[in-house]
From Swiss-Prot:
Gene3D superfamilies, sorted: YVTN repeat-like/Quinoprotein amine dehydrogenase
Record note on quaternary structure: Forms a heterodimer with the catalytic subunit TRM8.
Biological pathway: tRNA modification; N(7)-methylguanine-tRNA biosynthesis
Keyword Repeat on entry: yes
Keywords: Nucleus, Repeat, tRNA processing, WD repeat
Record gene name: TRM82
Molecular functions per Gene Ontology: enzyme activator activity
SUPFAM superfamilies: WD40 repeat-like
Name by which UniProt lists this protein: tRNA (guanine-N(7)-)-methyltransferase non-catalytic subunit TRM82
PROSITE patterns: WD_REPEATS_2, WD_REPEATS_REGION
Family membership: Belongs to the WD repeat TRM82 family.
Source species: Candida glabrata (strain ATCC 2001 / BCRC 20586 / JCM 3761 / NBRC 0622 / NRRL Y-65 / CBS 138)
GO biological process: tRNA (guanine-N7)-methylation
Amino acid sequence: MFVHPLNVAISDSQNKYQYVVCKHTISVFAGEKLVGYWVDTDQRDSHNSYKKLKSNAGDAKPKGSQGIGAPAVYSYIRNLRLTSDEGKLIACVDSDKSVVIFKIDTSAEDPEKFLQVMKRQQFPKRPNALALADEDTTIIVADKFGDVYKLKIDEEPIRKIDDQSEPILGHVSMLTDVAVAKDANNKSYIITTDRDEHIKISHYPQTFIVDKWLFGHKEFVSSVDLPKWQTKFLFSAGGDKEIFAWNWQSGELLSQYSFEDAVKPFINDQHLAPARFQNEENNVIEYAVASIKSCGQQPYVAFFVEATPVLFILHCNTETGELSLAQQVEFKHNVVSISSNGKSEYLVTFDNRDENAEQLIAFLTYSGDSNKPFSVDENLNKLNSSWISTFKQKDELLADADSVYPLYNIASLKKHGEHFS
């Protein structure tokens, strides 16, 4: 048995507290010390609760598992987000299709009181992404089936959201990411992306008014990012073999960076297309960018291709938007998630499904060296041993090779012929 990989990791702006998701739990560390711990007690029993699908004969049958030997249903916690005052934490929870808002009590001595549930709002469909608006008083929630809702943080939960609150905008396909931006005149916009190669920019709160579309992607868009160091820029990535840099305010595509050659040495059998989409030689490869994140204070943007052990870091010209490869950082294990904070640090989590794995997370700090702008912080890296020791004391966080939650779901967003018929 080993500690399950960390699905998500973020920190506050100064990296005093680290918030990490492991399966259906959220742990909060202050360096080596576990100061907060929350377990989703509403999680479903994945071994006994199966979704039903209708067979051609009309009989109900259990839905197949997501992987060999894996349970059919997984209670993910995803999309951790801190409010700008860092007093609240927001998470999307799969077990009951909800958004959970926590009040953070840094004075709490009991780890179970550090994160206090303020509100738990269920949605008709699984929340897929979230952003903050209205000076962090409103959460913008995008769901799996293409609808976007707004949720007031301080209001009571709505019993039946479909009856009392309608979507503020929508797409015809699965939403993959959402962001909120302001232009030079302080007007707000919602930026949404989907499985159909679309980036849509809508006025907010008048979301029925579409400001523009950003056209250029030929495959699905999985991730967008708005850098703090140039507020008119937007970065996007997904199923294409390029990273896109936009001026979202004018709608101009500023540049594209092709990573096809750079990632080629890291492509392996995990990137083979599903059997039903293979050719006779069985060599059709499919891969996608799982996440793209700009650096907090410096003009860099990092991304990784799903199921690879390398992080690519691009430099961005803040005047022209031109992207160029500044560095690639290789690790022992595949990257699972990345995030950045206000100290120009990246937090990187790994697929450490190895009995002897000693690294759950790495911290990359900005060095200022133009030839190697980021380096692994060895002092922070020492936190791995203390975190692993803490997690090993909690049985719910241990796993074996057959019980790891599916970590690689992005490439499956790619559309094939059956999706267009």
